[in-house]
Regions:
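Short alpha-helical
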Residues: 44, 118-121
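Internal catalytic-core helix/loop-beta-alpha segment
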Residues: 70-118
């Protein structure tokens, strides 16, 4: 598989009431095809959030945004553009980071969370020097992280509830 230069095509989802910010790396091939975050049907992000928040699993983009806004959750990614093979985070190179300061200036974000180790490492390298706000790295909800069962993910991700 060849490297492809990808530029992030989604706006961040947040408003002035957002209390936590969850950052991924970059939308996957499937997410870009579906025009929204965590669009791969095997990605457990939406199912996990719905479970933790005692909500129905959202199906449409509007339902997903509604659940985020209702629960004061902002989402975006750490990468504005990069070179990547398919959806493989391990292949990411030539990163141009997003500027999350616009979210932090608008919303009273209590905690930043990284969805997976790669997002956490990139946040630490690029955004932490700009924000001074440490991120908590959580296990990835990606289907590539099959070693983590849904139950284990739920246990690890319950910590987001403390800041909501």
């Amino acid at each position: 598989m060849e490297y492809e230069h990808i530029t992030h095509s989604f706006e961040p989802v947040y408003d002035e009431n957002s209390r936590i910010l969850i950052l991924g790396t970059l939308p996957s091939v499937k997410s870009r095809e579906n025009n929204f975050y965590y669009g791969h049907k095997q990605n457990r992000f939406w199912k996990l959030l719905a479970y933790l928040l005692d909500e129905s699993v959202p199906e449409t983009i509007d339902e997903k945004k509604y659940m985020l806004f209702k629960n004061h959750i902002a989402i975006w990614d750490v990468i504005q553009s990069c070179d990547i093979k398919g959806s493989s985070d391990s292949s990411i190179k030539n990163v141009e980071p997003t500027d999350i300061r616009k979210i932090l200036e608008t919303a009273d974000i209590k905690q930043v969370y990284a969805n997976g180790n790669k997002a956490g490492a990139l946040y630490k390298k690029y955004q932490l020097p700009l924000t001074g706000m440490e991120a908590v790295t959580l296990p990835s909800t990606s289907p590539a992280n099959a070693a983590w069962s849904f139950e284990r993910l739920c246990e690890a991700w319950t910590r987001i509830l403390a800041n909501l």
